[in-house]
UniProtKB/Swiss-Prot annotation:
GO biological process terms on file: ribosome disassembly
Function: Catalyzes the GTP-dependent ribosomal translocation step during translation elongation. During this step, the ribosome changes from the pre-translocational (PRE) to the post-translocational (POST) state as the newly formed A-site-bound peptidyl-tRNA and P-site-bound deacylated tRNA move to the P and E sites, respectively. Catalyzes the coordinated movement of the two tRNA molecules, the mRNA and conformational changes in the ribosome.
Subcellular localization, as worded in the UniProt entry: Cytoplasm
Protein's recorded name: Elongation factor G
Keywords: Cytoplasm, Elongation factor, GTP-binding, Nucleotide-binding, Protein biosynthesis
HAMAP family with a match to the protein in the record: EF_G_EF_2_B (MF_00054_B)
Assigned protein family: Belongs to the TRAFAC class translation factor GTPase superfamily. Classic translation factor GTPase family. EF-G/EF-2 subfamily.
Keyword Nucleotide-binding: yes
Gene (name only): fusA
Organism: Metamycoplasma arthritidis (strain 158L3-1) (Mycoplasma arthritidis)
Claim: Heme is one of the keywords in the record: no
Length: 697
C-alpha cells in the first residue's frame, strides 16, 4: 500500500501546559476544525473527546495522554494531549520522548505558571522544538505582551511573537499576522469564520515595529536575511517563514501566537503555525540506538528495517491490552512478528489500530512517522524497543522514570476481592511505570506507591470503577530511602556444616558511597578464589538485601560494591550460600558504613494574593522549607518556590485554603533526596524497629 502522506508532511506533536490553561479545550477545537469531530465537547461540562476516562470527565483534568490523528493544510497531524497536573508528569515525559514538536499553551492572565516550568524543562531535555499559544485572551487580566515576557524572564526562552492581538479581555476581537502583515477578525462561532480587515490604524506603528524586530530575531539563523537587513532590502514573506521554521527547528527559538480557544478565536492561525514551523520526522536528528557496546543512528525512512518504541501500555475494556508505539523506521504489516529487544522476547502483531482518544480503527500497516497501537502484546511495557527480528541486537534509547515518593496501605474490602485486587494492580502497574505495589512482609498488607496523593486517589478510583474492586485505604506514607556515607571492607560468611552436604559461602566486599549513580557491582576476584558461577548470586544477594534495606526497612540506594576476596568449599558451596553470605556482609556493615535515612524533598510552588505573603512564608519555614525563589506574576499574584520535605506536606491543601480564605493554590513535584535530620531519623528507626531483620545463622 502506497504512503498516503509524504514523510515531510507529517507533524507528530504534543499539546502541553499547566493545569487549567485550556489545553484540552484547544485540542477539541483543533479536532473540530480538522473535521475529526462534528460537535465540540466542553471540558468543564465533562464532554471532552480527548478526556475519555471517567475520572478525567469528573475532575476536568487530563490524566492519560490520548492520541489522535488529524489533517490540516495538506499535512497529517498526530496529536497527543498530555496532562498538566504534576502527579501525571510521567505521561508528559513519555509522550515528549516520541514527539517531534510541541505546542505549549499558556493562560494569558497568568503567563508562565509552575507546571509550565516543569513541562518546559522536560521538553528542553528531549530537545523538542516548540511554538507557544497564549490562550484565554478574552479573560479579565489577559496580557499577551506580559505572557511573552514571562517566557523570557522565567524560562529564559528566546520567545518572539509572530502575531499581535487586536484588543484584550472582552475586547479581544482579532489578530494581526506579523509575517504577512494581515489582520483578521473572528465571528466567535464554532466554525471560527475569519474575515480579513485592514490593520487598525492605532496598531499599525506597533505592528510594523514588531515585524522588524521579528525579522531581526531570525537573522541569526539565516544569512540571506542578515545580508538583506545590512543592505536595507525588503525580505519576502516566504524567506521570513523559512527562517522562522529553521530557527524553531533548532529548539532554541520559540514563535508565540495567541487566541481564545473557548471563544473560537485564533485556533486556525495556530494550526497554520504548527504546519509552517514545527518539524516533520525528517527534520529531527535520526533516532539513537545501541548495538552491542556501540551507538548507531537509524534514519527515518520506509526503506530501513522496522524499528519502534512502545511509549504507553493501557487496558482497553473492549480489546484488552493496548500498546502505543512510535515508528522510527520501516513498515509493519499486521499479522507479522516483531522482536522486543529490551526484554528478549518475540511478539506477534495480530491487530494494528489507529486511535482517536478511546475509539479505534483497524488498519493493515504502519510506516515511519506513524503512531499506532498494537493489541494483545504479552511482554512489552513502556520504553521497550519493538524491532525487525533480523535486527534483534539493536535497542533504542530508553526512557527513565522517577521512583514513587508516596505510599499507602491498601486492603481488599472482602476476601473475594483479594485475587481481583492482585490482577488489577498488575495491570495498572503495567500501564504506569511510576506506580508500584508490593506486599509488606511484616504486616502482610498490600502497599501502593506513586508520585502524589492525586495519583494514588485516581488509582484507587480506577480499581473501584474499572476493575470493580472495593478497597480500604490507609493514610499516605513517605517513601524514605537509605544510603551509606562511608567506605569499608566487610566480610560475609554463611556456613552450616554438620554432617552430610552443608552450606558454605565466604565473601569480602568493599562498599563505597555512589551518589546519584544507583547500585554498581564490580567483580575483582582473581585466581579463582570464588568460582565464576557464584558471582551472579553474590550480586543478586546484595540487590535483594538493598531492596529491603539495612537500617529501617527502606530501599538502600547509591552503593558501589566491589567483590575482592573470599573462599569456597568444593562440596558445600552453592549459589544460595553465596547469596546469603553477600546479604550478611551488607547487614554487618550497617554501622561502619555510616548508614543514614534519606527523605524525598519536593519542589513546591505556592500561588497566593499579596495579603497572605507573610503568613505563608512563616508556614513554609515551620515545615522545614527552604525558599528558593519569590516572584510576582502578570496578574499580581505572588509565586513562592521552596524545597519542602514531603513528610511536611500532607494535608497542606486544606491548611493553605484556610490560611488564604480559599484563594491560595499550590503544586509540588519530587526534586531530590536529602539526609533526614538525626532526631527525626531516630524516631522512624525506632517506630520501624521490627522491620529491620538482622541475618542470623
Amino acid at each position: 500500500m502506497a504512503r498516503e502522506y509524504k514523510l515531510e508532511d507529517y507533524r507528530n506533536i504534543g499539546i502541553m501546559a499547566h493545569i487549567d490553561a485550556g489545553k484540552t479545550t484547544t485540542t477539541e477545537r483543533v479536532l473540530f476544525h480538522t473535521g475529526k469531530i462534528h460537535k465540540i465537547g466542553e471540558t468543564h461540562e465533562g464532554e471532552s473527546q480527548m478526556d475519555w476516562m471517567v475520572q478525567e470527565q469528573e475532575r476536568g483534568i487530563t490524566i492519560t495522554s490520548a492520541a489522535t490523528t488529524a489533517y490540516w493544510g495538506g499535512k497529517r497531524l498526530n496529536i497527543i494531549d498530555t496532562p498538566g497536573h504534576v502527579d501525571f508528569t510521567v505521561e508528559v515525559e513519555r509522550s515528549l520522548r516520541v514527539l517531534d514538536g510541541a505546542v505549549a499553551v499558556l493562560d494569558a492572565q497568568s503567563g508562565v505558571e509552575p507546571q509550565t516550568e516543569t513541562v518546559w524543562r522536560q521538553a528542553t531535555n528531549y530537545n523538542v522544538p516548540r511554538i507557544v499559544y497564549v490562550n484565554k485572551m478574552d479573560k479579565a487580566g489577559a496580557n499577551f505582551k506580559a505572557s511573552t515576557e514571562s517566557l523570557r524572564k522565567l524560562l529564559g526562552a528566546n520567545a518572539h511573537p509572530i502575531q499581535l492581538n487586536i484588543g484584550e479581555e472582552a475586547q479581544f476581537t482579532g489578530i494581526i499576522d506579523l509575517v504577512e502583515m494581515k489582520a483578521y477578525e473572528f465571528d466567535g462561532k464554532p466554525e471560527e469564520n475569519m474575515k480579513e480587515i485592514p490593520i487598525p490604524a492605532h496598531l499599525l506603528d506597533e505592528a510594523t515595529l514588531m515585524r522588524s524586530s521579528l525579522i531581526e530575531s531570525v537573522a541569526d539563523f539565516d544569512e540571506e536575511i542578515m545580508e538583506a537587513l545590512l543592505e536595507e532590502k525588503e525580505v519576502s514573506i516566504e524567506k521570513i517563514k523559512a527562517a522562522i521554521r529553521k530557527a524553531t527547528l533548532s529548539a532554541t527559538y520559540f514563535p508565540v501566537v495567541c487566541g481564545t480557544s473557548f471563544k473560537n478565536k485564533g485556533v486556525k492561525l495556530m494550526l497554520n503555525a504548527i504546519v509552517d514551523y514545527l518539524p516533520s520526522p525528517l527534520d529531527i536528528p535520526p533516532m539513537k540506538a545501541y548495538k552491542g557496546e556501540g551507538e548507531i543512528s537509524i534514519p527515518a525512512s520506509d526503506d530501513e528495517f522496522f524499528s519502534s518504541l512502545a511509549f504507553k501500555v493501557m487496558n482497553d475494556p473492549y480489546v484488552g491490552n493496548l500498546t502505543f508505539f512510535r515508528v522510527y523506521s520501516g513498515i509493519l504489516n499486521k499479522g507479522t512478528y516483531l522482536y522486543n529487544s529490551t526484554k528478549g522476547e518475540k511478539e506477534r502483531i495480530g491487530r494494528i489500530l489507529l486511535m482517536h482518544a478511546n475509539s479505534r480503527t483497524d488498519i493493515d500497516e504502519v510506516r515511519t512517522g506513524d503512531i499506532g497501537a498494537a493489541v494483545g502484546l504479552k511482554f512489552t511495557t513502556t520504553g521497550d524497543t519493538l524491532i525487525d527480528e533480523k535486527h534483534k541486537d539493536i535497542v533504542l534509547e530508553n526512557m527513565n522514570f522517577p521512583e514513587p515518593v508516596i505510599s499507602q496501605a491498601l486492603e481488599p474490602a472482602s476476601k473475594d476481592a483479594s485475587e481481583k485486587l492482585s490482577l488489577a494492580l498488575q495491570r495498572l502497574a503495567a500501564e504506569d511505570p511510576t506506580f508500584k505495589y508490593y506486599t509488606d512482609e511484616e504486616t502482610g498488607q498490600t502497599i501502593i506507591a506513586g508520585m502524589g496523593e492525586l495519583h494514588l486517589d485516581i488509582i484507587v478510583d480506577r480499581l473501584k470503577r474499572e476493575f470493580k474492586v472495593a478497597a480500604n485505604v490507609g493514610a499516605p506514607q513517605v517513601s524514605y530511602r537509605e544510603t551509606i556515607t562511608k567506605s569499608a571492607e566487610v566480610e560475609g560468611i554463611h556456613k552450616k556444616q554438620s554432617g552430610g552436604k552443608g552450606q558454605y559461602g565466604h565473601v569480602w566486599i568493599k562498599y563505597e558511597p555512589n551518589p546519584d549513580k544507583g547500585f554498581e557491582f564490580v567483580d575483582k576476584i582473581v585466581g579463582g578464589k570464588i568460582p565464576k558461577e557464584y558471582i551472579k548470586s553474590i550480586e543478586k544477594g546484595l540487590k535483594e538485601k538493598m531492596e529491603i534495606g539495612i537500617l529501617a526497612g527502606y530501599p538502600l540506594i547509591d552503593v558501589k560494591a566491589t567483590l575482592f576476596d573470599g573462599s569456597y568449599h568444593e562440596v558445600d558451596s552453592s549459589e544460595l550460600a553465596y547469596k546469603i553470605a553477600a546479604s550478611k556482609s551488607l547487614t554487618k556493615g550497617r554501622e561502619m558504613l555510616g548508614t543514614v535515612l534519606l527523605e524525598p524533598i519536593m519542589d513546591v510552588a505556592v500561588v497566593i494574593p499579596e495579603d497572605f505573603f507573610g503568613d505563608v512564608m512563616g508556614d513554609i519555614s515551620r515545615r522545614r522549607g527552604q525558599v528558593r525563589d519569590n516572584e510576582t506574576r502578570n496578574d499580581g499574584a505572588h509565586v513562592i518556590k521552596a524545597y519542602i520535605p514531603l513528610s511536611e506536606m500532607f494535608g497542606y491543601a486544606t491548611e493553605l485554603r484556610s490560611m488564604t480564605t480559599g484563594r491560595g493554590t499550590y503544586q509540588m513535584w519530587f526534586d531530590h533526596y536529602e539526609k533526614l535530620p538525626r532526631n527525626l531519623a531516630d524516631e522512624i528507626i525506632k517506630k520501624r524497629g521490627g522491620k529491620v531483620k538482622i541475618d542470623e545463622d
